[in-house]
Regions:
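Acidic, metal-coordinating helix/loop segments flanking the phosphotransfer/catalytic sites
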Residues: 5, 27-44, 48, 52
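Acidic di-acidic motifs
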Residues: 8-9, 100
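Two-component/phosphorelay signaling modules centered on CheY-like receiver
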Residues: 11-29
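Conserved phosphotransfer microenvironments
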Residues: 47-67
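His-Asp phosphorelay/catalytic-motif detector in bacterial-type signaling
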Residues: 69-75
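Hydrophobic/aromatic residues positioned on beta-strands within the core alpha/beta folds
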Residues: 77-79
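As written
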Residues: 90-98
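C-terminal output helix
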Residues: 102-113
Length: 117
């Protein structure tokens, strides 16, 4: 079973992703703060740009670098309301950027596509 880590500080969004991904057959772990992020092995990470209140490329890149250091080689899908993140997707190292608000069917489809590579 594909293990997915969801990182989002908004309880509604985190719970929605937990339910949608769980219903799609994924093993889902949710972290709402950086302290909550477990050290176990995952196949994919779906993350909000948690530490980025006002978007800057540098802050977004710092967040994704921290995830890459903690989970080397694990693909990251960014789910964010920051339109600039889509423009910077390749430079940020995100496998995909999904804009909030999103169609709930996009999340499991993106995880399937990302983990199939």
């Amino acid at each position: 079973m594909t293990r997915v880590l969801v990182i989002d500080d908004d309880i509604g969004t985190a719970e929605l992703m937990r339910v949608v991904l769980g219903d799609a057959g994924f093993d889902v772990t949710v972290a709402m703060t950086t302290r909550d992020i477990p050290t176990q092995k995952f196949d994919c990470i779906v993350s909000d740009l948690m530490s980025v209140q006002v978007y800057t490329y540098e802050d977004a890149r710092d967040w994704l670098l921290r995830l890459a250091d903690r989970f080397p080689g694990i693909p990251v899908i960014v789910v964010t309301a920051h339109l600039e993140a889509r423009r910077d997707q390749a430079a940020l190292g995100a496998r995909r950027v999904i804009m909030k608000p999103f169609d709930v069917d996009l999340i499991p489809a993106a995880v399937r596509e990302t983990t199939a590579r």
